[in-house]
Amino acid sequence: MTSEAIEVLIVGGGQAGIAMSEHLTERGIRHVVLERERVAERWRSERWDSLVANGPAWHDRFPGMEIPGVAPDAFASKEQVADYLAAYADRIGAPIRTGVEVNSVRKREGANGFHVETNAGAYDARYVVAATGPFQLPSIPPIIPEAAGVTQLHSSAYRNPSQLPEGNVLVVGAGSSGVQIADELQRSGRQVYLAVGPHDRPPRSYRGRDFCWWLGVLGLWELNAPPAGAEHVTIAVSGAHGGRTVDFRELAAGGITLVGRANAYENGKVRFGADLAKNVEEGDANLFALLDAADAYVERNGIDLPEEPEARRLLPAPASMTNPLAELDLAEAGVSSIVWATGFRADYGWLQVDALDEHGRPRHQRGVSTEPGVYFLGLPWQSRRGSSFIWGVWHDAKYIADQISIQRGYLVNEPAPDSQPYASLRAGAARPSAVDADAVPGSAAPAPVTAQTTGTHA
């Protein structure tokens, strides 16, 4: 069976794959993007109906294009985000092939590059970029067995309250997804129990500026690693209902029963950790720390922004905090459904090269894999705190494109047998004038590494 030769093969047609395509196109590097479903599929079919972006439209976008029909300070719906990504891909002419699932990537025997098997044929690629991100498989802790007699689903499968059977609901996980789903269910008339773990809860806005702006001017988007001990702390922020600060005391005052982390299950009862008050109070402390930093920045720079003392006011601790539930009998409480907002795990089973650790996680430095020729894109904290955002992945993609350009420069004078698909990489091969995913890869001297432009958060 013949294989199609391509210089760079990108796996994944979401925001990371699109950003990667843009920067490779600018450098004249031939490539193809393989997407197993539609462009931005996860935004379209694996999120709840009312989801909006967690950041304002001026922030959660690519640098070169605004989100059509969305005011800069508004929060785009999931449909608007998906349509935006597809429109951006069209604008840059990204060579995306949809409906193509990558089954395996292996090193080529006796030759440079990688052999890629898909459901629509095979490829031989000089470089491979894994742009699928880490959110591939829903992660549900093995706590409550299926025999418990309640409906259990992951947040990626939740759509709206009417999807769930009649009865009360336990939501496990108090990050952005868990908080918004719990709030939606409570507003629909359900009695909701919300299991709260460690979290950060930044202000939605403070002194007239969104928290995304504050993280930018304070340099916090550029942190290259989470603070020690906070590696698994989730962030609770919401753009729902026009955007508001997540306040667990306020959620409790509205009728949601807060509980600690779900730890175990036995005889129809879910047991919770004795950590609820600690988790809520540490989230409050995180909020106040950012407010303090913002106030200091305003004073230090003489900026005229209105003071906002009400941002520091807390409601009294609810009864669920002062006298927390140690366990919940699901039947007695009328709980018929459990929504697990407990995140995802990566799935790189198709990447069959020496690029993963013993836990299946990428081994890399700023996306450059320990396997020469393989790159990762779209990882949280790939280079900085902002790497998970659209603008952040765009800058990470620029860096990866620069690295590929440098590596191509080393190969310009590489002797390559004419029988290999990379014969045109020899010295003197013409620089491609346009992206052509169907052509045998050409060659180019490495593109100059330009200074990184300012992110949209600054």
Model-derived features with residue positions:
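Flavin (primarily FAD) cofactor-binding/catalytic cores of flavoenzymes
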Residues: 2-45, 75-432, 436, 446-458
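Redox-cofactor-proximal catalytic regions of oxidoreductases
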Residues: 40-64, 251
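A short small-residue
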Residues: 62-66, 378-380
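A short acidic, helix-capping loop that chelates divalent metal ions and anchors anionic groups
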Residues: 68-72
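Long, low-complexity intrinsically disordered regions
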Residues: 442-443
